[in-house]
Amino acid sequence: AGRGSRGAGATAASEGQDVSDSPATPAAGADHRCGTAAIIGRPNVGKSTLVNALVGVRLSIIGPKPQTTRHRILGIVSKPQGQILLLDTPGLHAGGARAINRQLNRAARNAVAEADVCVHLIEAGRWTDEDQLVRNVLSDSSRPRLLVLNKVDAQKDKKQLLPFLQKVGSDGFYAGVFLISARRRDGVDALERAIIEHLPPGPAQFGEDEFTDRSERFLAAELIREQLMLRLGQELPYSATVEIESFADNESGMSEIHAAIWVEREGQKAIVIGKGGEQLKAIGSAARLAMNRLFGRRVHLKLWVKVRENWSDDEAALQRFGYSE
């Protein structure tokens, strides 16, 4: 993989691209470990929140709706004892006949197949048919599996979790069971140590200050899509995607970004733009501020809304927009 993106404050020339003067990767001692960990689960159990808690930056977009995550995002966690390459997967789900649903499930299954460790994230006290689907997928992997109960802070009576734990985590299928609140970072450090312990020995693959292998161009599109998730109605965000048409730094060090928001119908276009363009303006303003924080420099963002009918069920469109692996 190419060199990863760094934290805010890195120079513009070194972010989101291959650079020959990247800092050396951390030295690997005899006990140093490095490998991939797939964060897997049904939609909306907090996978992106957990990735962000582990990496230490808001790398994966977070939203109240299922299927916020559409791409596998590699987050990099560097510790003295090891380096974790995190795969944040789309939620595995039953049903969904459109091409994009099939592609999202395929991406999640591929992450399980290539991971050194699989982290099965569920909601504390709740086991659904889709959780069982995830477990069935994990049964095809011989890699270590960790069961993680998230949102324990929402449980009023923690004692009720004991019979639940006996039911879902006591048959030896999982190498370990953890209770966490990803939102509050409760229990996250212990989970991090356990993931590293199950990784294979090896040197780090990325520098200590790199947090993702995704380019700033990709992250910019994700931040725009996050605002679509947060600001639009229940269904429309699933018919929208973002394409970065140009991304360049000017002489003053500001990034000039032009992006297209693609929807499937003219009526959806009108909703995204809003009365007098106010909705599109709000989306752009919030996304721009998020980019300023993540990239550590000023961003000038221009947005357009375009229509491509039924793009989410069009294999050629999915490939163009980066969904096909």
Model regions and ranges:
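Conserved glycine(s) of the Walker
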Residues: 46, 187, 279
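Active-site glycine-centered loops adjacent to acidic/histidine catalytic or metal-binding residues
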Residues: 88, 150, 181
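Canonical P-loop GTPase G-domain recognition
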Residues: 144, 153-212
